[in-house]
């Protein structure tokens, strides 16, 4: 992060703009909207500045830049078409420990100004760090269309209710659940937009007096195979509402960066052949946190119901009477194959797909005879350590040694790596790869050279 986003309180504080043209005028509007006590210095001014000065909204200082104008300032903006003058303003401000923005020269500035979506008191700022103002503007336009104009009224009304809500609800968790109900209540939003005081009061009283469910809950969320862009919208909503997020090592850092900042994070990383935290203990963590009345998200790589032990975890919650729900995720087989250019089914090569775990509970045995049949695709999860055995068993049961195979490491991530070969090479290929990896076996692998679209490291 090159810039720390902050919101400045400038009301009745001295600010300086050097420049009297159109660019300076746009900056002046923002500072005036923020209530700043504004001085503008330039050799000449466009008419808007004169109009503002005549209305007593700002002070004009006509003439060359004088560094003493900065002596009482909190913030300055250099907005002239003279690079040397802008640099001089910046250096003078720096010497006085005053933040200074230099228009169109972010490297010379000590702060930059973002694109703003104004739903006062709710404010959203978008910045590209000065590298691409056009991109920031396009993002702002998209956000403008997503955020209702009356959102500011809802935020302002919430501010008026804070004291009462604090008295009504004893804990932070209860208050947060109330606010979540209020902010998604369409009737209240519409009543505020229409200034319908009777409806506002009725809806508010109903929301405040409606009993809250003090039980916690657990939401099982599939994080997808790695690329944060593959996290579902509902999954994103859940991790941003969670009090506690229990996650494993298959959840990428990019996805964890989307978690609500003040949520507790509990790492229970697991890998094939080694469990950092025993499954029974994970079950108890979920139960314990939910019994405290917290909203718990169990965040799992891929899909929680495909080799994710989601069923085992939910059985514990069900037996204890804890409410739960499930948000599916894109499973590794689907994500890794798509990002590797390998269709799992194809009219000419595969009419079915089998998803198989590479390690079983002690004493488990696969139906190798059926797995060795043609016209299907096999996908082995967590099979890297058993690759040589998989190779041997499939060949023993009749699968041709030249059957195409691929191993996908860190599928869908920028560090994705894919190697392919034949079944007779599977054990050898596996020694070149690291976990997490997925093994794909079938004629469809032969289409990879033609259909691969994602970079291969």
Swiss-Prot record:
Residues 216-457 are annotated as: Uroporphyrinogen-III C-methyltransferase. NAD(+) binds at residues 22-23, 43-44. It catalyses: uroporphyrinogen III + 2 S-adenosyl-L-methionine = precorrin-2 + 2 S-adenosyl-L-homocysteine + H(+); precorrin-2 + NAD(+) = sirohydrochlorin + NADH + 2 H(+); siroheme + 2 H(+) = sirohydrochlorin + Fe(2+). The modification Phosphoserine is found at residue 128. Keywords: Cobalamin biosynthesis, Lyase, Methyltransferase, Multifunctional enzyme, NAD, Oxidoreductase, Phosphoprotein, Porphyrin biosynthesis, S-adenosyl-L-methionine, Transferase. GO terms for biological process: cobalamin biosynthetic process; methylation; siroheme biosynthetic process. It holds the Pfam family TP_methylase. InterPro entries: 4pyrrol_Mease, 4pyrrol_Methylase_sf, 4pyrrole_Mease_sub1, 4pyrrole_Mease_sub2, CobA/CysG_C, NAD(P)-bd_dom_sf, Siro_Cobalamin_biosynth, Sirohaem_synt_dimer_dom_sf. S-adenosyl-L-methionine binds at residues 225, 301-303, 306, 331-332, 382, 411. SUPFAM superfamilies: NAD(P)-binding Rossmann-fold domains, Siroheme synthase middle domains-like, Tetrapyrrole methylase. Pathway: Cofactor biosynthesis; adenosylcobalamin biosynthesis; precorrin-2 from uroporphyrinogen III: step 1/1; Cofactor biosynthesis; adenosylcobalamin biosynthesis; sirohydrochlorin from precorrin-2: step 1/1; Porphyrin-containing compound metabolism; siroheme biosynthesis; precorrin-2 from uroporphyrinogen III: step 1/1; Porphyrin-containing compound metabolism; siroheme biosynthesis; siroheme from sirohydrochlorin: step 1/1. Its EC number is 2.1.1.107, 1.3.1.76, 4.99.1.4. In the N-terminal section; belongs to the precorrin-2 dehydrogenase / sirohydrochlorin ferrochelatase family. HAMAP family: Siroheme_synth. This is Siroheme synthase. It comes from Escherichia coli O157:H7 (strain EC4115 / EHEC). The gene is cysG.
